[in-house]
């Protein structure tokens, strides 16, 4: 595996592969890799000739009171994991290379990005869309891989790619979980032992949402309220966002029965926010399958 630090070097190295018609897969990350990231790598390697992983903690997607400086970083550890996973190229640019001067161009998908997590983190998804767009321009990949844990992000990136006619296939990969069901996340390292034990309320809340859906609850407001109440049974957990949405458009639902439903959770434990979600398939669809 080769570690590349600059945009120009990466473009030069990938040019021969592109001329030879090789498929390039791309996994953008902010580092401090876990099993979920490695699953994205495995998918890319299985489907492409060359795999590029980027590690870049993007300052544009952090708010003024968020954890940019504290975000976990360990490039040596991450590089060792990627080497063992047979990644071809690790792109680890400095902020000064990605943003040599203050950005005046911003890519925003406001209808999708200003709701749900975007309500709690104003400007976050504009920062995400801007850096992902720039990385797509740099790498020129045929396919890019994103975890479904960050479902809103995945929907936003797909829409950006469609709107901007970017020639890349966006692949969503199923959420990888710990043995107790908690979604793998770089931010899990922030949790104290007590908070880590309490965090299991998040996947359990998704189970409860599915149980209520299967029982015939049709009013989205009632279902959201029930999920909030369920999460609040854990004293250390605060539900910041509980949303039932259309999984393709993120539109609010007036009724949940008779259609697939995205249940999206944004739960705070101490200073740590955990994201999780589940798309609950319509019963009739499952029976017909």
Curated annotation (Swiss-Prot):
Its EC number is 6.3.2.1. Its main location: cytoplasm. One of its GO terms (molecular function) is ATP binding. The active site is at 37 (proton donor). (R)-pantoate binds at residues 61, 153. It comes from the Bacteria. It is an enzyme of class 6 (ligase). GO terms for cellular component: cytosol. It is found in: Cytoplasm. SUPFAM superfamilies: Nucleotidylyl transferase. Beta-alanine binds at residue 61. GO terms for biological process: pantothenate biosynthetic process. Belongs to the pantothenate synthetase family. This is Pantothenate synthetase. The gene is panC.
């Amino acid at each position: 595996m080769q570690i590349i630090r600059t945009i120009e070097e990466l473009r030069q190295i990938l040019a021969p592969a592109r001329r030879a018609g090789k498929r390039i897969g791309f996994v953008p990350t902010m580092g401090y890799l876990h099993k979920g990231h490695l699953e994205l790598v495995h998918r890319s390697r299985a489907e492409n000739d060359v795999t590029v992983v980027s590690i870049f903690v993007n300052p544009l997607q952090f708010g003024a009171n968020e954890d940019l400086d504290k975000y976990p970083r360990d490039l040596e550890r991450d590089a060792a994991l990627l080497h063992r996973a047979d990644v071809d190229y690790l792109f680890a640019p400095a902020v000064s290379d990605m943003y040599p001067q203050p950005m005046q161009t911003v890519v925003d998908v406001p209808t999708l990005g200003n709701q749900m997590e975007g309500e709690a983190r104003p400007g976050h998804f504009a920062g995400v869309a801007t850096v992902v767009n720039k990385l797509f321009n740099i790498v020129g990949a045929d396919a890019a891989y994103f975890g479904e844990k960050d479902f809103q992000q995945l929907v936003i990136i797909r829409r950006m790619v469609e709107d901007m006619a970017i020639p890349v296939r966006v692949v969503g990969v199923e959420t990888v979980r710990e043995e107790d069901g908690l979604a793998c996340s770089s931010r899990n390292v922030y949790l104290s032992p007590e908070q880590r034990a309490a965090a299991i309320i998040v996947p359990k809340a998704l189970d409860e949402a599915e149980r209520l859906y299967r029982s015939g609850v049709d009013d989205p407001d009632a279902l959201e309220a029930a999920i909030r109440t369920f999460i609040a049974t854990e004293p250390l957990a605060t539900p910041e966002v509980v949303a039932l949405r259309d999984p393709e458009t993120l539109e609010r639902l007036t009724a949940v029965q008779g259609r697939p439903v995205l249940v999206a959770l944004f739960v705070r434990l101490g200073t740590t926010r955990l994201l999780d979600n589940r798309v609950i398939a319509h019963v009739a669809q499952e029976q017909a399958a």
